[in-house]
């Protein structure tokens, strides 16, 4: 009877240790996933900021082109 308690205790201890390792591995994987996602978010944020600058430049150029066209139309009407 004493031996079966020792074996049972060893099985329980081994299970607890294996479960702890599994949890640490999962935690490490999740931590790495979060870091990867944060890096991707930072990159996307930088991309969005660059695109915003390009959009503003395109709007400014379109406004200048429209102004030139308006000036040409006015000169033909005279």
From Swiss-Prot:
Q: Where is the lipid attached (N-palmitoyl cysteine)?
A: 21
Question: What span is annotated as the signal peptide, if there is one?
Answer: 1-20
Q: What UniProt keywords apply to this chain's record, in alphabetical order?
A: Cell outer membrane, Cell wall, Coiled coil, Lipoprotein, Membrane, Palmitate, Peptidoglycan-anchor, Repeat, Secreted, Signal
- What is the predominant subcellular site recorded for this chain? membrane
Q: Lipid (S-diacylglycerol cysteine) attached at which positions?
A: 21
**InterPro entries per record:** Lipoprotein_leucine-zipper_dom, MOM_Lpp
Residues where N6-murein peptidoglycan lysine is found? 78
Q: Which GO terms describe its cellular component?
A: cell outer membrane; extracellular region
The sequence repeats extend over 24-34, 38-48
What membrane topology does the annotation report for this chain? Lipid-anchor; Peptidoglycan-anchor
State the Gene Ontology terms under molecular function.
Answer: lipid binding; peptidoglycan binding
Where in or outside the cell? Cell outer membrane; Secreted, Cell wall
State any GO BP term from the record. Answer: lipid modification
PROSITE patterns in alphabetical order: PROKAR_LIPOPROTEIN (PS51257)
What positions belong to coiled-coil segments?
27-75
Describe the function of this protein.
A highly abundant outer membrane lipoprotein that controls the distance between the inner and outer membranes. The only protein known to be covalently linked to the peptidoglycan network (PGN). Also non-covalently binds the PGN. The link between the cell outer membrane and PGN contributes to maintenance of the structural and functional integrity of the cell envelope, and maintains the correct distance between the PGN and the outer membrane.
Quaternary structure annotation from Swiss-Prot or TrEMBL: Homotrimer.
Family, similarity comment: Belongs to the Lpp family.
The protein depicted here goes by the name Major outer membrane lipoprotein Lpp
- What organism is listed for this UniProt entry? Morganella morganii (Proteus morganii)
